[in-house]
């Protein structure tokens, strides 16, 4: 009998942090929530909480150690933490001036460095799971900034872009860990040397869009994200690493259409805060 799967949810804020985990719990997952506002320990609903501040990348090893000891080895890791300040759209590089560069360091840590360290620890955790374990997926809650430059999101966008590069890199570099391939009519399976089907490591930069391919900003839908993340967690093969999706239709490939037009846009929907 296989062990109960474990969702490690890093960055459990008041929106997605309350909407995504119940979807996994209903699917039979043990749930671990991590945020700086939480206190360590099991909760009445069975969830396990861990306190951590992701502006400090060295917090990640301790989080993984606690989860392994108290709950079990994570089978799915979601990185959802976000922290940044909007830059001055008239002078965005002023955020890197000596008096304000700390906000750049924080944005890069929370949205870039810390999640990439989480990728490394997730890889180590996934490797210790039985080969046939479903999941072994790391999902990063991304946005359009790895494609498009918004005038007041220099620091945030640099961090998101760095993480997107790392996740894409991981999806290629660790593809070999899906073992040798055996092709059958109409199906592609990944098998070990004993002929048993294997589930490989998977990495995703998940990005909800409108039906026209534009960013949803604050309107990101937690239920839709939970459904898509669960779908990614339960597939046995790597889907597109840049997993753009819409609330009603799931995955959609928007390509590069018109993204850079937002660089000079002063339209409110391009300057408002949010993810």
Language model: regions and residue ranges:
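Rossmann-fold cofactor-recognition segment
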Residues: 44-59
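Conserved glycine-rich Rossmann-like NAD(P)H-binding loop of the short-chain dehydrogenase/reductase
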Residues: 27-42
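C-terminal helical subdomain
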Residues: 186-275
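Hydrophobic positions on the long internal alpha-helix
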Residues: 78, 118-122, 166
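Conserved NAD(P)H cofactor-binding loop of Rossmann-fold oxidoreductase domains
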Residues: 78-92
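N-terminal Rossmann NAD(P)H-binding glycine-rich loop of SDR-like oxidoreductase domains
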Residues: 12-23
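Catalytic loop of short-chain dehydrogenase/reductase
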Residues: 83, 95-117, 127-176, 186-193, ...
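Conserved Rossmann-fold cofactor-binding substructure of NAD(P)-dependent oxidoreductases
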Residues: 55-73
């Amino acid at each position: 009998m296989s062990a109960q799967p474990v969702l490690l949810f890093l960055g459990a804020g008041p929106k997605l942090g309350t909407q995504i985990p119940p979807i996994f719990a209903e699917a039979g997952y043990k749930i671990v929530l991590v945020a700086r506002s939480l206190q360590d320990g099991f909760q009445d609903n069975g969830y396990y909480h861990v306190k951590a501040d992701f502006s400090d990348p060295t917090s990640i090893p301790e989080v993984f150690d606690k989860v392994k000891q108290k709950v079990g080895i994570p089978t799915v890791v979601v990185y959802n933490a976000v922290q940044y300040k909007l830059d001055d759209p008239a002078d965005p590089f002023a955020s890197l001036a000596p008096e304000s560069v700390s906000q750049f360091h924080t944005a890069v840590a929370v949205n870039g460095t810390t999640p990439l360290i989480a990728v490394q620890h997730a890889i180590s955790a996934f490797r210790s799971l039985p080969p046939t374990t479903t999941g072994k997926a790391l999902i990063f809650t991304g946005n359009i900034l790895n494609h498009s430059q918004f005038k007041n999101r220099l620091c945030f966008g640099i961090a998101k872009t760095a993480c997107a590069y790392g996740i894409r890199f991981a999806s290629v570099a660790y593809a070999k860990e899906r073992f040798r391939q055996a092709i059958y009519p109409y199906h592609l399976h990944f098998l070990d040397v004993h002929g048993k089907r294997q589930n490989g490591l998977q990495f995703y930069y998940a990005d909800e869009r409108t039906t026209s391919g534009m960013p949803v900003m604050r309107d990101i839908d937690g239920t839709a994200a939970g459904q898509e993340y669960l779908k990614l967690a339960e597939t046995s093969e790597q889907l597109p690493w840049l997993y753009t999706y819409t609330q009603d239709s799931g995955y959609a490939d928007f390509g590069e259409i018109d993204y850079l037009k937002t660089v000079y846009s002063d339209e409110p929907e391009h300057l408002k805060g949010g993810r």
